[in-house]
């Protein structure tokens, strides 16, 4: 069990799983930074280690509320070479050894020769956010096995309390994934869901288990992400063309949906052709003479073109710019999650197919519509009272999506007023979530 005095002084050690800064997905990066921000809000001098499946070990520097913060990045591996110090099997073996020989000196010895063991064995608290939405098998069984089950189960084998930060739970469509999900959720200390349907989903999974209030609702942590102006912004001539009367609409195009998912065969069972839908949305918007459209990517994966937003945005820009010259603008270049949030903040209205692109807008009180491909959109918008601002592309026809966009656009002033009131309250709830993390 954690040492109480250790948790209240400058030596608090925190391990964060399911987070990464190198996936190219700005939503995942936003979740990672926001999670660390919340942890440091509770323990300002904590030593934070991100134990993930990223590219390489190292240090990552953050600027949080004007303060420079450095976190350690360690990579857990699931490859064929089971003898690597960072391999899941090696870590599991060490956990078993510590169960048999639970001596403090032995734990210190193992931690000193293997930093990956130390990250878990020496941790006072362990948190996991599962990339926000990977506690589900909709992205494939292998991904759920690693992120949804094995990483979390490993924490419990080190006899550490696991706190699941606000995320989406389910759907788990296979009996085996439901069984693994139940195994993890039963052993977690606290389970935070970022939507009310997630709370109910977990309760239903654990129907015969005494939960004692362990399942709680807290909105998505990315609402507290800091916006930061990048040194260089390339959005064409938008700022020169824009006038006081202009309405700038940000449009985030998902490369994953644009290419039909990983299978490239409408993997998410959308009811309408996504490429045609995006084109129709822009044509619909262009009826407003003062309107300008800024295409904003949110996932940068040039080596995985099926997911890459910039490639999708560029293709659509070339097609649309010919028809609407001087009214379509493209965000070019590479940006981090803070930069992209700043760029989204330049818009008056936003439409996104990446949920965290929408959150970047909403958290700055910018009215937004989510073109959804999964249930996570509905839950997050619902958490701030904007469930009507979701257009489910997997249930709605093209006409229905356009109707939802039109209603939100017409009501943007009302939505902005609503957001201005509720967003500060949402941020306070998220940051104060840490007050429940009592010393064991």
Residue ranges and their predicted role:
Residues 1-440:
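Active-site anion-handling motifs in enzyme catalytic cores
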């Amino acid at each position: 069990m954690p040492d109480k005095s250790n948790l209240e002084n400058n030596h608090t050690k925190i391990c964060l799983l399911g987070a990464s800064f190198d996936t190219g997905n700005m939503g995942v990066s936003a979740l990672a930074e926001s999670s660390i921000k919340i942890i440091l809000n509770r323990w300002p001098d904590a030593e934070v280690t991100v134990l993930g499946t990223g590219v390489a070990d190292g240090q990552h520097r953050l600027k949080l509320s004007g303060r420079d913060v450095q976190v350690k990045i360690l990579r857990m591996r699931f490859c064929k070479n089971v003898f690597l110090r960072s391999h899941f099997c090696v870590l599991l073996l060490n956990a078993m050894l510590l169960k048999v020989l639970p001596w403090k000196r032995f734990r210190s010895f193992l931690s000193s020769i293997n930093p990956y063991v130390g990250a878990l064995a020496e941790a006072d608290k362990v948190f996991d956010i599962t990339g926000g939405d990977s506690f589900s098998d909709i992205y494939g069984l292998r991904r759920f096995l690693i992120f949804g089950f094995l990483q979390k189960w490993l924490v419990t084998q080190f006899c550490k309390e696991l706190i699941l930060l606000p995320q989406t739970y389910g759907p788990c469509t296979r009996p085996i994934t439901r069984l693994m999900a139940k195994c993890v959720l039963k052993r977690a200390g606290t389970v935070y869901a970022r939507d009310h349907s997630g709370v109910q989903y977990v309760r239903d999974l654990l129907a015969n288990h005494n939960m004692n209030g362990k399942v709680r609702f807290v909105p998505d942590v990315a609402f507290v992400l800091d916006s930061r102006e990048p040194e260089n912004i390339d959005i064409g001539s938008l700022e020169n063309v824009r006038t006081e009367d202009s309405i700038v609409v940000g449009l985030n195009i998902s490369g994953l949906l644009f290419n039909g998912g990983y299978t490239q065969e409408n993997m998410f069972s959308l009811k309408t052709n996504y490429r045609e839908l995006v084109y129709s949305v822009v044509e619909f918007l262009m009826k407003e003479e003062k309107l300008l459209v800024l295409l904003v990517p949110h996932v940068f994966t040039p080596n995985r073109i099926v997911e890459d937003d910039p490639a999708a945005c560029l293709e659509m820009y070339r097609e649309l710019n010919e028809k609407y010259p001087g009214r379509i603008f493209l965000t070019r270049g590479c940006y981090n999650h803070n930069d992209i949030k700043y760029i989204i903040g330049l818009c008056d209205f936003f439409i996104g197919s990446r949920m965290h692109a929408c959150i970047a807008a909403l958290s700055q009180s910018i009215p937004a519509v989510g073109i959804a491909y999964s249930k996570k959109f509905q839950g997050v918008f619902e958490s701030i009272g904007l469930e009507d601002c979701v257009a489910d592309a997997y249930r709605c026809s093209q006409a229905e999506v356009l109707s939802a966009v039109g209603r939100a656009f017409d009501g943007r002033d009302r939505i902005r007023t609503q957001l201005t009131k509720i967003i500060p309250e949402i941020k306070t709830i998220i940051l104060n979530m840490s007050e429940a993390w009592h010393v064991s």
